[in-house]
Amino acid sequence: MKPLNIIFAGTPDFAARHLQALLNSHHNVIGVYTQPDRPAGRGKKLTASPVKELAVANNIPVYQPGSLRKEPAQQELAALNADIMVVVAYGLILPKVVLDTPRLGCINVHGSILPRWRGAAPIQRALWAGDKETGVTVMQMDVGLDTGDMLLKTYLPIEDSDTSASLYEKLAEQGPVALLQALEGLANGTLAAEKQDEALANYAEKLSKEEARLDWNKSAKQLWQEVRAFNPWPVSYFEHQGNTIKVWQTQVSETTSTAAPGTIISASKKGIEVATADGVLTLLSMQLPGKKPLNVADILNARGEWFSPNTRLANEAQ
């Protein structure tokens, strides 16, 4: 297969993994687009994205326009004369004139099995909803949000132990493999594009800190899904004793209870059992303010008096 001249557009670590795969391939990455440097850390020092750092280390020209809607930026991109543009978690909207510029158009690697979970947080929403599988879709981009024709899909079962952090890692390995397969198929003309079924489409909204508050009036199963979805960010939490307590790991208990939602049923080194609207949730790993995440045995050693049976934990709906 003849090497393709590729423009790569992406910003976070997930995107950098895909750029590395392209750099390891026989294709030519002729330019990299990434978001402008942003203030980060306590000192708010301007910091380059992981994609920019990788591109600079490999002596690839880097472009960081604040927008691709203006003609000078569009002309600069067109002058690269790329065969194709690969977009992974870039964060800027590509207008139609940009989508139409490369000979083979623009393709995107998306962390879900489209058309399910279009949008910003597909990995997290799959866990949040209790999906049994997720995966990666490589699609031909159009002007819509993740609405383009699908070129290739890979599938990944979601395990009970998975969190957003672990799924992110698995998909960051699966995505680059799918990307290289899709590029080969496009170059050879062997890929058949498949339209998305709009009836099956839904939207993966961004997560918010407020959404991560545990509402004991939900079911134990839903809360268990949320804790996994919101790990590593924004991390599920509840208010108790005037403190915000983060919850990193839970499981659905086989215990049954008629106690009011938010009531502690039992507290031992095996876990703190809390009644919900449907079932009992066992808290296994938590984080007290200013401390590291700890297993429940250590939490009880430090603050056992906070978690006595029959204590009621704060609840949004109280």
UniProtKB/Swiss-Prot annotation:
A cellular-component GO term for this protein: cytosol
**Is Electron transport one of the keywords UniProt gives this record?**
no
Catalysed conversion reaction: L-methionyl-tRNA(fMet) + (6R)-10-formyltetrahydrofolate = N-formyl-L-methionyl-tRNA(fMet) + (6S)-5,6,7,8-tetrahydrofolate + H(+)
Gene3D superfamilies tied to this protein: Formyl transferase, C-terminal domain, Formyl transferase, N-terminal domain
**Superkingdom, natural source:** Bacteria
Coiled coil location: none
- Cite the EC number: 2.1.2.9
Would the keyword Transport be found if you checked this record's keyword annotation?
Answer: no
Q: Identify the residues that bind (6S)-5,6,7,8-tetrahydrofolate.
A: 112-115
Q: Which GO terms describe its molecular function?
A: methionyl-tRNA formyltransferase activity
Keywords attached to this Swiss-Prot or TrEMBL record, sorted alphabetically, are:
Protein biosynthesis, Transferase
Family per UniProt?
A: Belongs to the Fmt family.
NCBIfam families, alphabetized: fmt
Q: What does this protein do?
A: Attaches a formyl group to the free amino group of methionyl-tRNA(fMet). The formyl group appears to play a dual role in the initiator identity of N-formylmethionyl-tRNA by promoting its recognition by IF2 and preventing the misappropriation of this tRNA by the elongation apparatus.
| Identification of the protein by name | Methionyl-tRNA formyltransferase
